[in-house]
Amino acid sequence: MSNKSNESSKSSKSSKLSKLSEGEEKKMDDEPPIALNLGCGKNILPSEQGWINVDGMKNDGVDVVFDLDDCRTSPLPFDDDSVSVVLLSHVMEHLHHTLPLMDEVYRVCKSDAKIIIRTPHGASDDAWEDPTHLRGYFPSSFEYFSQPMYWRADYGYKGDFKSEVVNLYIENKVLKDDTNEEIIRKVMHERNWVSEMEAVLSCIKPARKADKQLRSVPRLQILKRGPDLNPEGQNGIGAQGKQMKEVRNDSKDNVVELVD
């Protein structure tokens, strides 16, 4: 067979593969987005909405049994760039190996995928009274899942998530006649004011450089909740309470300003 015939054969084969690839991509675009409920425990979310419930224990409703602390040696059982939403609700504070997990979450997430992380506030008793809690989290903790934060230290972490907003929840029963400024001061400096945090992160691909100048600070929102404000309790993802006041963290030195 001549070189010309070989080239023609290769071109034809390449064209068929290209068409097949385009068809597969279209099929993938038509499929519902994948959403991972990692460390779901008993908080099972509906599969008809695209949720895959993952936990280290095989309980009712768990779709995939996987120990998240195994991410140092075993990959999450999902394809690269396949996931649109990840929920980690009261999981992170229980883990020994946080960065390996976030590396794996980064691998499986599409660009601009949303990651919702809920934890107790590090300055609350809820963060430490449970003997299975290994570490406390604060509003700035989620910035360590971004590459720009590693401008002065390299821990081998390769993922890059931008911390967009951190919701700080206050129970309505603790509020009295405090002014807005007093509430903000107490939230930022006193114990047991914030009962829970909810961070919303975006997956950045390709990853940014480990450059201090690229660091961004999340927007902070203070919200109140209680039986009279949120009778249905937690359900899926998203805000769980009624907004009380919003604060903005515009400085890279973590200065908080009141937004009217």
Q: What annotation goes with each model-predicted range?
A:
Residues 14-17, 85, 122, 181:
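General secondary-structure edge motif
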Residues 2-5, 10, 16-75, 216-260:
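Conserved N-terminal segment of class I S-adenosyl-L-methionine
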Residues 21-23, 30-35, 85, 112, ...:
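A generic short-segment signal for beta-strand/edge and adjacent turn/coil regions
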Residues 99-100, 110, 114-260:
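S-adenosyl-L-methionine-dependent methyltransferase catalytic module, highlighting the catalytic core
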